[in-house]
Amino acid sequence: QINKKKLPLMDTVISAVNCTYPKADEKEIEFVFDYAKELETCMVMQDKRWLGEAIINVLDNAVKYSPEHSKITIRLQKRTGFVRIEIEDQGIGIPQSEYHKIFQRFYRGTAPEVREKSGTGIGLYLSRQIIEQHGGTITVASGKVRKGSTFLIQLPENGLS
């Protein structure tokens, strides 16, 4: 059950990064933050636990499929009507033909690098469900295969300050 309160979005993002940090540290992956100062105090209607879980799922995948000594960039941007969280990795990328599939329950990519890693294929499905319950969307953009992926989470301006 989602129980939304007006809370700082940055706190939720930082908590999610902190949960993912040990795995990233093992691979010497650096987290890079990119945001305007005003976003440090940006308040969003959210269930911190559940929204944090949605972000953790995306970050876990970014760490899992990124090479050692790479970086994951987390951008926060305030736009008209919404706030956007971008999570960009330097991993294996996602073929465009799979964009519509990766948010389906139990779907796992077809690349050999995906198959050799453990996973159930439920993380991104749950992230989408949680984000949609927050009135938001999650999409993916990938460069060329093996050039990383960028996940875009958009949350409504409703509750922003």
What are the residue ranges of the model-derived segments?
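Short conserved segments within the C-terminal catalytic ATPase subdomain
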Residues: 23-35
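Short helix-loop "hinge" at the ATP-lid/N-box region of the Bergerat-fold HATPase_c
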Residues: 62-63
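A conserved beta-strand-to-alpha-helix junction within the catalytic ATP-binding
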Residues: 3-18, 30-32
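Conserved glycine-rich
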Residues: 136-137
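Short conserved segment of the HATPase_c
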Residues: 94-106
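Conserved micro-motifs of the catalytic ATP-binding
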Residues: 1-4, 41-46
